[in-house]
Amino acid sequence: MNLKEKLAELKEQGLAEIKEAKDLKKINDIRVSLLGKKGPITEVLRGMRDLSAEERPKVGQFANAIRDELTQALADKKDEIEVIKMAKKLEKETIDVTLPGVPVTTGNTHIITQIIDQIEKLFLGMGFQVVDGPEVEEDHYNFEMLNLPQDHPARDMQDTFYITEKILMRTQTSPVQARTMEKHDFSKGPLKMISPGKVYRRDTDDATHSHQFHQVEGLVIDKHITMADLKGTLQLIARTIFGEDREIRMRPSYFPFTEPSAEIDVSCFKCNGKGCSVCKYTGWIEVLGAGMVHPNVLEMAGVDSNVYGGFAFGLGPDRFAMLKYGVDDIREFYLNDVRFLSQFSQKG
């Protein structure tokens, strides 16, 4: 019997064994016994050295074809056994679809994030852009660019977390506005932006103060901007957050980066302006600060204050949440008490 005949006989024997295999162990045993280093096919192939140079490649090609055929047959049989095994397993593990499902506990968006998202949605709909910036900020952008010279009281060490002499944790999100004004090309249109984010102050944590809290500051720069534009924008904020029937009033105030400046009150949403403990019986609740952008701030950003004007405002989502939901202690928002936070879960 020549080598080709031996190989053909081994192939038929191998295919028959593969066909009769019932489990994966048997498949592996056949693979090792047929195709392994000590298997019969390997032994036959060792006899190729006695063949002539003309016969050797023909027999080698024939042997490789048989090896490939057996390898494929082993793989097919393995897949067949695994399918049968899985079918038997599924048959034993029948699921009763009439049983009630297991409830899945889902997370909720934090109430402060909900307020910020609500504000962002409002302003994106008005064509504003939402701009982020660094929390570790330069003194230049946090103070100097906002009309706060070196000797201004707000720059006192007791109010600010200084990292180095010129680097600090931002005390407001206004530096984002200063950076954006520097880069904005006003020949392509006005600047309308809000800058939400975390800010830091050297405050002792108590019911109404925190060393870290949130701000959303807004800025509009264009030609012919007036106080009426500011008032209309603030009215929209108040009605979006606190209810459609809210009114606002503006009281004169002082901020270094705006002139004129105003404190903004909203008519009390608990008593509708009649007077209650929430509004301290005044009918009004202070909610934010605002004003027309100071010419010095425009000029320091490279904007011609004789051509352009604008308004700015700043509000605290933490305070908004406290007022809207009657929370007396700001620390409740940061204690990660799921029982407290789940009260504000969004449905649907």
UniProtKB/Swiss-Prot annotation:
Its cofactor is Mg(2+). Gene3D superfamilies: Bira Bifunctional Protein, Domain 2. It holds the Pfam family tRNA-synt_2d. The keyword Iron does not apply. Its EC number is 6.1.1.20. Mg(2+) binds at E259. GO terms for cellular component: cytoplasm. This is Phenylalanine--tRNA ligase alpha subunit. It comes from Ligilactobacillus salivarius (strain UCC118).
